């Protein structure tokens, strides 16, 4: 709830607590978890808390930098599904930064491919994955989907 205080979103303790409770439930956590210490949470739960901390401020745009890279495959899937659900519910736009093309394919509509800090390709997910134009994009796709 610190973000609520800093950004003065709610002066009322009752509204403050209601907003916290709503976002905790939205990200798939239990209300009794609010009294736990940080070391008592799993990696997936910590990621859900990070998402809740961002969303409680009611942004239109959320920048996610490698949000699933430290998570195992099962938890990655859960977090991606959660992000898609929250995107729809809260009408969010994401800038999703990742090296994992399988995750990018699952969550993105538009994709920007960068090499050495320079944009080499920007197109729809369909075009990037089905007919990439830049050789670097082609190389990335080939190496990512060899399995």
Predicted features along the sequence, with ranges:
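Conserved ABC ATPase "signature" region
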Residues: 2-5, 14-32, 141-142
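Short, glycine/charged-rich "phosphate-handling" switch motifs in NTP-dependent
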Residues: 110, 122
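A short, surface-exposed alpha-helical micro-motif characterized by mixed small hydrophobic
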Residues: 104-106
């Amino acid at each position: 709830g610190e973000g609520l205080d800093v950004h003065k979103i709610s002066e009322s303790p009752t509204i403050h607590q209601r907003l916290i409770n709503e976002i905790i439930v939205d990200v798939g956590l239990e209300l009794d978890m609010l009294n736990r210490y940080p070391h008592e949470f799993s990696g997936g739960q910590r990621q859900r808390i990070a998402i809740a901390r961002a969303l409680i401020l009611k942004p239109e745009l959320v920048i996610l930098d490698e949000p699933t890279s430290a998570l195992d495959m099962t938890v990655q899937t859960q977090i991606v599904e959660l992000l898609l659900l929250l995107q729809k519910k809260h009408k969010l736009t994401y800038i999703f930064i990742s090296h994992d093309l399988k995750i990018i394919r699952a969550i993105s509509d538009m994709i920007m491919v960068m090499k050495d800090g320079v944009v080499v390709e920007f197109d729809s997910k369909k075009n990037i994955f089905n007919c990439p134009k830049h050789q670097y994009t082609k190389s990335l796709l080939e190496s990512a989907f060899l399995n």
